[in-house]
Design a protein with these regions (language model features):
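Short, polar/flexible loop-turn hinges at active-site or ligand-entry regions and domain interfaces
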Residues: 73-76, 166-169, 247
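N-terminal Rossmann-like or analogous alpha/beta NTP/dinucleotide-binding catalytic cores
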Residues: 2-10, 15-156, 268, 307, ...
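Conserved nucleotide- and phosphate/pyrophosphate-binding catalytic cores
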Residues: 21-23, 63, 174, 180-360
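Short catalytic-loop micro-motif centered on adjacent basic/acidic residues
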Residues: 101-104, 167, 244
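A generic structural motif
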Residues: 15, 166-167, 221
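Conserved RecA-like P-loop NTPase ATPase core
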Residues: 90, 171, 212
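Internal, conserved structured core segments that host functional sites
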Residues: 135-182, 186, 190
Length: 360
């Protein structure tokens, strides 16, 4: 099958909780930019979320019980809330439904049909080599069939709309290689239906968490994108620093606060702050003669976060107050994605000798 004439970009985001700065600089910022560069498809991966939903419910119950509560959110409530949050977050941060196709994975049921068909040409050995499966099981995720066959569903997500470009992090390259393998298995067994998707490896920075490790929900060290007020200040002021005395020179290159500040600042602003680290008494008059400390740097970081995400927070509040509009966006995206999916499945069914799908 010939590849689309233009760039067809696809990426999914799993609804697994509040988005944080690591998500933004690692993926979301790139996704928003890519909607201007090709035919972009972005989906909320609620089918994928089912593989870890019970663990999410257990964490919710554990947190509630530790807080002395007797009720907590069910798995169903967690999934619905997380899907809604992803939709609100992406739209507030600049995803434009007039430029990109934005939809829920579960609103395109053709994906599950293609998943089954791909599974019939995919060897067990390929899936057994998936490092993400082993990693998740080692972290206590229940080893279900769904978790084991996760790469097949991911391949179906990509191939169902004949995407040829997929923005991924380095930890996801293996899944895309497996997608190419599955596309090749099908094309060789039946007919040349699928294009060969290629990875788009961005230069996403490693975002440090509040404890200095990579920012991740699993480490509990995140700064949420849409946190504000006291919650945001508490997170920023909790960023770990060393014990260098206030009046002593400090090394910006080993400081978590400086690393976070650089993500928001211009090169000139970062250079200024670095100089302030090295010369704590610089501009001391503005601080009533006091040396510059990590607390001052955290205040600068806090101001940068507010400046970057303040307008998006307001947009998110407006969208949250209008759930019908958000649902309309997702439904419209699903209609467009399903139109592409049906074209692909028609060719797949023809290739394997199945009858055409009944008209709806």
């Amino acid at each position: 099958m010939p590849e689309p004439a233009t760039k067809r970009i696809l990426s999914g985001v799993q609804p697994s909780g509040k988005l944080h700065l690591g998500n933004y600089f690692g993926a979301i910022r790139q996704h928003i930019a890519l909607q201007e560069q090709g035919d972009a498809f972005y989906f909320i991966a609620d089918y994928h979320a089912l593989t870890t939903l019970k663990e999410a419910e257990a964490r919710e119950a554990d947190a509630a019980q530790k807080a002395g509560k007797t009720t907590w959110k069910s798995a169903r409530e967690i999934l619905a809330e997380n899907v809604r949050d992803v939709a609100l977050d992406y739209l507030a941060l600049g995803l434009d439904p007039d430029r990109a196709t934005f939809y829920r994975q579960s609103d395109v049921p053709e994906v599950t049909e293609l998943t089954w068909i791909l599974s019939t040409v995919t060897g067990m050995g390929l899936l057994e080599r998936a490092t993400s499966y082993k990693d998740k099981v080692s972290k206590g995720i229940t080893p279900t069939v769904g978790l084991f066959t996760y790469p097949v569903l991911m391949a179906a997500d990509i191939l169902i709309v004949r995407s040829n470009l997929v923005p991924v992090g380095k930890d996801q390259v293996q899944h895309l290689e497996m997608t190419r393998d599955m596309a090749g298995y099908f094309n060789q067994a039946y007919d040349d239906v699928f294009p060969e998707p290629r990875e788009m490896l961005g230069d996403a920075p490693t975002v440090p968490g509040t404890d200095g490790q990579k920012m991740s929900k699993s480490y509990g060290n995140t700064i949420e994108i849409f946190a504000e007020g006291k919650a945001l200040k508490t997170a920023v002021m909790g960023v770990v620093t060393d014990s260098t005395p206030l009046e002593e020179p400090k090394n910006p290159e080993t400081c978590n606060v400086f690393a976070l500040y650089k993500l928001f600042a211009t090169a000139g602003e970062a250079a200024q702050l670095a100089e302030q680290y090295r010369n704590p008494m610089l501009n001391a008059d503005a601080r009533k003669g006091r040396a510059f400390g990590y607390g001052d740097a955290k205040q600068l970081l806090l101001a940068k976060i507010d400046a970057r995400f303040g307008p998006a927070r307001e947009r998110r509040k407006q969208l949250a107050a209008d759930p019908v509009t958000v649902e309309d966006v997702l439904r419209a995206g699903a209609r467009k994605a399903r139109a592409e999916a049906r074209k692909t499945l028609a060719l797949v069914r023809q290739a394997v000798g199945m009858a055409a799908a009944p008209a709806e």
